[in-house]
Amino acid sequence: MSKPKRERSLPDNEAKAVARMLRVSPQKLNLVAQLIRGRKASAALADLAFSRKRIAVDVKKCLESAIANAENNHDLDVDALVVSEAHVGKGIVMKRFTPRGRGRSGRIFKPFAQLTIVVRQVEEASA
């Protein structure tokens, strides 16, 4: 006997994807996440494709995963998807040391971040 299915935390017209352990500070990742919040999924993909930020490649991969989840797992229309949420969280922080003068050492922090993207299917307003 298997366990009963867990109740879905998102509404039926939403799908999500999570990217963890992204090697960038949450502050820098949030700059790229702000570009796509509230945009149509196709426009957000185009923005990320031409962004000059290094982390935009990973954000684009996560957005493509959210779109694929919406299409394959939840049978949503890809052309009607909008990025409803793109929020950034802190991950772990690796601490490294670098030699300094007079026998001392300095700390270097190497932060990681997490990204959650939620896409929602919107009904087109008939004009």
UniProtKB/Swiss-Prot annotation:
Oligomeric form and interacting partners: Part of the 50S ribosomal subunit.
Gene3D superfamilies to which the protein is assigned, alphabetical: Ribosomal protein L22/L17
Function: This protein binds specifically to 23S rRNA; its binding is stimulated by other ribosomal proteins, e.g. L4, L17, and L20. It is important during the early stages of 50S assembly. It makes multiple contacts with different domains of the 23S rRNA in the assembled 50S subunit and ribosome. The globular domain of the protein is located near the polypeptide exit tunnel on the outside of the subunit, while an extended beta-hairpin is found that lines the wall of the exit tunnel in the center of the 70S ribosome.
Native source organism of the sequence: Rhodopseudomonas palustris (strain ATCC BAA-98 / CGA009)
Listed name of the protein: Large ribosomal subunit protein uL22
Molecular function GO labels: rRNA binding; structural constituent of ribosome
A Pfam family recorded for this sequence: Ribosomal_L22
One GO term (biological process): translation
Cross-referenced SUPFAM superfamilies: Ribosomal protein L22
GO cellular component labels: cytosolic large ribosomal subunit
